[in-house]
Amino acid sequence: MLIFWTITLFLLGAAKGKEVCYEDLGCFSDTEPWGGTAIRPLKILPWSPEKIGTRFLLYTNENPNNFQILLLSDPSTIEASNFQMDRKTRFIIHGFIDKGDESWVTDMCKKLFEVEEVNCICVDWKKGSQATYTQAANNVRVVGAQVAQMLDILLTEYSYPPSKVHLIGHSLGAHVAGEAGSKTPGLSRITGLDPVEASFESTPEEVRLDPSDADFVDVIHTDAAPLIPFLGFGTNQQMGHLDFFPNGGESMPGCKKNALSQIVDLDGIWAGTRDFVACNHLRSYKYYLESILNPDGFAAYPCTSYKSFESDKCFPCPDQGCPQMGHYADKFAGRTSEEQQKFFLNTGEASNFARWRYGVSITLSGRTATGQIKVALFGNKGNTHQYSIFRGILKPGSTHSYEFDAKLDVGTIEKVKFLWNNNVINPTLPKVGATKITVQKGEEKTVYNFCSEDTVREDTLLTLTPC
């Protein structure tokens, strides 16, 4: 009996969680759902604020290149800075093995200054993020509480409301934003840039980013393939009001993974190979960066899956329109009451990521031949290159439809150029044409019609004009 009670007391003691409290931030425990679960088996407490060393670095239109430090311990640093009470404020929060005093974080501030007057605060918690992954994932809680504390200071000391605040977080930083939002009623917006999967996916909402953390939550997924075996860092779980899955959300054009990297331990994976191994994961903030200067180049289409999107089943935009992935996603807020909607789009491979989707339908004329047909669009803003619409048997009277993503918005479409070829010598020299070509831009209801009665031989351009 003595042995029984000894074992029982030992087990009760082992099951009892630990807790640590930090002044002004509250208490943090390692019990469920923060630890001791299937998703978070290790019980780890977050580091102290002093050890994490979070800094709030303010950039404004008046000081775009040199930051001013805002101190939680001294609110007067806000009043002494260039912080403007009549402007919106955007916090940018980096993720695992990253830093907030240079690189993409400060680049984002500078891009913002090109389109708006804004207070841009970079949250630098590099000491807390440059730990083992499991420790950094738990440090998220303290950093989130510190961001919430800064928002509370702005409200209580300067009557600056959270309704003017937007939190932008990448990787672990997305969950930092969620943590801060859960403690800040009335927060306007959170943008999650590829929120990480490990230690957060399928956890209760209090642990991760979720739609209740702000009035509007938009999420961009770029590395959502399973962590095992594909080494996808991001989550596939929908965590916002609007969840965007560019290029399907798993493999981004221009990114290739090294199979050998899959055997590297997660805690050391970023050292020396961050940009190479995490290309998909990093694309989320690169897309956001480019979206700032491209208000209409990232239209995303509601669809059940990327397969359906690629099968031309989700074109054009519905009556309520399509949201823009990235900086201007909030222009769609309020146009739908639903949460966790999926949106899909395609992007370019490297820089110039913006794309404009067009749907084309071609009715053929002339002789029956084997080959492929292509079209190029010409508008008042420019023209596209030739896009392949169909390959196979070209029969007169047959109609072929296809959607493609152009590198530019051609504006009002004025004419279409048709081309066909098969790269095989045909002694009969058949002629093929298009009696009608219809074109629609995905974001518009206008359908452009172009006609021609002519036919042309292989590799000869045929111009169709409005009809």
Swiss-Prot record:
<dbReference type="InterPro" id="IPR033906">
    <property type="entry name" value="Lipase_N"/>
</dbReference>
<feature type="binding site">
    <location>
        <position position="208"/>
    </location>
    <ligand>
        <name>Ca(2+)</name>
    </ligand>
</feature>
<dbReference type="InterPro" id="IPR029058">
    <property type="entry name" value="AB_hydrolase_fold"/>
</dbReference>
<dbReference type="InterPro" id="IPR000734">
    <property type="entry name" value="TAG_lipase"/>
</dbReference>
<dbReference type="Pfam" id="PF00151">
    <property type="entry name" value="Lipase"/>
</dbReference>
<dbReference type="GO" id="GO:0004806">
    <property type="term" value="F:triacylglycerol lipase activity"/>
</dbReference>
<feature type="signal peptide">
    <location>
        <begin position="1"/>
        <end position="17"/>
    </location>
</feature>
<dbReference type="InterPro" id="IPR001024">
    <property type="entry name" value="PLAT/LH2_dom"/>
</dbReference>
<dbReference type="GO" id="GO:0019433">
    <property type="term" value="P:triglyceride catabolic process"/>
</dbReference>
<keyword id="KW-0106">Calcium</keyword>
<feature type="binding site">
    <location>
        <position position="210"/>
    </location>
    <ligand>
        <name>Ca(2+)</name>
    </ligand>
</feature>
<feature type="disulfide bond">
    <location>
        <begin position="303"/>
        <end position="314"/>
    </location>
</feature>
<feature type="disulfide bond">
    <location>
        <begin position="317"/>
        <end position="322"/>
    </location>
</feature>
<feature type="binding site">
    <location>
        <position position="205"/>
    </location>
    <ligand>
        <name>Ca(2+)</name>
    </ligand>
</feature>
<comment type="similarity">
    <text>Belongs to the AB hydrolase superfamily. Lipase family.</text>
</comment>
<dbReference type="GO" id="GO:0034375">
    <property type="term" value="P:high-density lipoprotein particle remodeling"/>
</dbReference>
<keyword id="KW-0732">Signal</keyword>
<feature type="active site" description="Charge relay system">
    <location>
        <position position="194"/>
    </location>
</feature>
<dbReference type="InterPro" id="IPR036392">
    <property type="entry name" value="PLAT/LH2_dom_sf"/>
</dbReference>
<feature type="active site" description="Nucleophile">
    <location>
        <position position="171"/>
    </location>
</feature>
<dbReference type="GO" id="GO:0008970">
    <property type="term" value="F:phospholipase A1 activity"/>
</dbReference>
<feature type="active site" description="Charge relay system">
    <location>
        <position position="281"/>
    </location>
</feature>
<feature type="binding site">
    <location>
        <position position="213"/>
    </location>
    <ligand>
        <name>Ca(2+)</name>
    </ligand>
</feature>
<dbReference type="InterPro" id="IPR002331">
    <property type="entry name" value="Lipase_panc"/>
</dbReference>
<keyword id="KW-0964">Secreted</keyword>
<comment type="function">
    <text>May function as inhibitor of dietary triglyceride digestion. Lacks detectable lipase activity towards triglycerides, diglycerides, phosphatidylcholine, galactolipids or cholesterol esters (in vitro).</text>
</comment>
<dbReference type="InterPro" id="IPR013818">
    <property type="entry name" value="Lipase"/>
</dbReference>
<dbReference type="GO" id="GO:0006633">
    <property type="term" value="P:fatty acid biosynthetic process"/>
</dbReference>
<dbReference type="Pfam" id="PF01477">
    <property type="entry name" value="PLAT"/>
</dbReference>
<dbReference type="GO" id="GO:0004465">
    <property type="term" value="F:lipoprotein lipase activity"/>
</dbReference>
<dbReference type="GO" id="GO:0005509">
    <property type="term" value="F:calcium ion binding"/>
</dbReference>
<feature type="disulfide bond">
    <location>
        <begin position="255"/>
        <end position="279"/>
    </location>
</feature>
<feature type="disulfide bond">
    <location>
        <begin position="451"/>
        <end position="467"/>
    </location>
</feature>
<dbReference type="InterPro" id="IPR016272">
    <property type="entry name" value="Lipase_LIPH"/>
</dbReference>
<keyword id="KW-1015">Disulfide bond</keyword>
<protein>
    <recommendedName>
        <fullName>Inactive pancreatic lipase-related protein 1</fullName>
    </recommendedName>
</protein>
<keyword id="KW-0479">Metal-binding</keyword>
<feature type="disulfide bond">
    <location>
        <begin position="21"/>
        <end position="27"/>
    </location>
</feature>
<feature type="disulfide bond">
    <location>
        <begin position="109"/>
        <end position="120"/>
    </location>
</feature>
<feature type="domain" description="PLAT">
    <location>
        <begin position="356"/>
        <end position="467"/>
    </location>
</feature>
<dbReference type="GO" id="GO:0042632">
    <property type="term" value="P:cholesterol homeostasis"/>
</dbReference>
<dbReference type="GO" id="GO:0005576">
    <property type="term" value="C:extracellular region"/>
</dbReference>
